A protein has these predicted regions:
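Short amphipathic alpha-helix with an adjacent loop that forms part of the alpha/beta core around
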Residues: 81-83, 290-295
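Conserved S-adenosyl-L-methionine
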Residues: 172-291
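SAM-dependent Rossmann-like transferase core, predominantly class I methyltransferases
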Residues: 149-185
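Short SAM/SAH-binding signature in class I
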Residues: 296-302
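Accessory substrate-recognition/RNA-binding modules or partner subunits associated with SAM-dependent
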Residues: 2-136, 142-144, 153-159, 166-167, ...
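SAM-dependent methyltransferase catalytic-core segment centered on the flexible catalytic loop
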Residues: 213, 219-243, 294, 305-340
Length: 369
């Protein structure tokens, strides 16, 4: 069976490396995510352990769909009764790119019609639609008139770990934070420092990664556990997978320091860390007053920009001056504006182009001599 794990634009190499570490077969990076092969057990492992994947999708079928009729017939040709019954709820999402069918809503509607018509003809009744929390999530991706139809193995987006209370302004998605930590080269042994921590996402993701706390344990049930095909054999395998994941957790990791000027967001970071089951060394401090750690640490941060910055460009100069004093440290910055790199006044050792939602950013990494 073919699977596709989706990832934020630019983070595909991080997801590829992660899925290879999970020893999944046939791992291959592509635009928007990573392909792998195997069975539902392999996909379940990705759901429990992947920090970077947003969704894990099972490929049901692919076919040419130049018009609505071809799309309907292609979807209807599958035996959906394997996964869907009249008692289960259903939701369909669609994306269209470079195709004659351009309206994603039309594509989603046609796909849903094909599935419910098939069930009504076969079983005498049809499933109902639940867009918020469906038992079976179907995704259709149309590119160059080729339709690929997927089932959502994970269910709700995997970025939701279950620990986030309320988001501070402009929160960083957990999956993007995990990708930043992986791409920047943190070894999970050096002290980790986020001097502009906000709600604590980077610090918490770092602490949970270092302690091998499986991110998927925050999900009570994944999507495939609600499919009609989910049987006792799979249930036992899932119970074992979850028990094994819990047993691998380490009691402690390297120190993780998180600071911010706002007492309100620090309180939020504390609440989030507690919910995630990790300890952060929290301190109210301006980034311009940042000191060194012993041994030299790894600084990773997402400085404010745009509306969050409120026109305070002097912050970047002060931040850059503080970073230049961190001899022996590594500094990784998610730069949402070129002004951040300009303030650093040196070329980064490594960089990646990433997207924080719609915002184009550069992850820049500096080794401070």
């Amino acid at each position: 069976v073919r699977f596709f794990a989706t990832a934020a634009k630019g983070t595909e190499p991080a997801l590829r490396d992660e899925l290879r570490e999970l020893r999944l077969p046939g791992v291959r990076a592509d635009r928007g995510g990573v392909h792998f092969e195997g069975d539902v057990g392999h996909a379940a492992r990705a759901c429990v352990w992947s920090r970077v994947a947003a969704r894990v999708l099972l490929e049901v079928t692919r076919f040419e769909a130049r018009d609505g009729e071809a799309l309907y017939e292609g979807v209807r040709a599958q035996d959906w009764t394997v996964w869907v019954t009249p008692q289960t709820t259903l939701a369909v999402r669609a994306t269209c790119r470079s195709s004659q069918l351009t309206h994603s809503q039309f594509v989603a509607q046609k796909t849903k019609d094909a599935i419910v018509d098939l069930l009504r003809d076969r079983l005498g009744d049809r499933p109902s639609v639940d867009r918020d929390d469906p038992d079976v999530g179907v995704t259709v991706h149309l590119a160059k008139d080729q339709a690929t139809v997927y089932l959502d193995v994970g269910g709700l987006s995997l970025h939701a770990r279950g620990w986030r209370a309320l988001a501070a302004e402009a929160p960083l998605r957990e999956t993007l934070a995990a990708a930043i930590l992986r791409l920047s080269g943190w070894d999970r042994e050096r002290p980790l420092v986020d001097p502009m921590c906000g709600a604590g996402t980077l610090a918490i993701e770092g602490a949970t990664w270092a302690r091998k706390l499986a991110p998927g344990l925050g999900h009570a049930r994944f999507g495939f556990e609600r499919w009609a095909s989910h049987d006792d054999v799979e249930r036992r395998a899932m119970a074992e997978l979850r028990a094994s994941a819990r047993a691998q957790a380490l009691p402690a990791g390297p120190p993780v320091f998180a600071s911010d000027v706002s007492p309100n967001v620090l309180a939020l970071a504390q609440r989030n860390a507690r919910a995630a089951g990790v300890e952060l060394v929290l301190e109210r401090k301006d980034v311009r007053d940042l000191g060194t750690t012993h041994p030299p640490g790894f600084v990773v941060t997402n400085p404010p920009y745009g509306e969050r910055l409120d026109g305070d460009f002097a912050l970047y100069d002060g931040m850059a001056r503080a970073f230049k004093l961190l001899h022996g440290h590594t500094v990784a910055i998610l730069a949402g504006t070129p002004a951040i790199e300009t303030a650093m006044r040196r070329r980064p050792d490594r960089y990646w182009q990433l997207y924080n939602g719609p915002i184009e950013c550069r992850l820049v990494v500096y080794s401070i001599e």
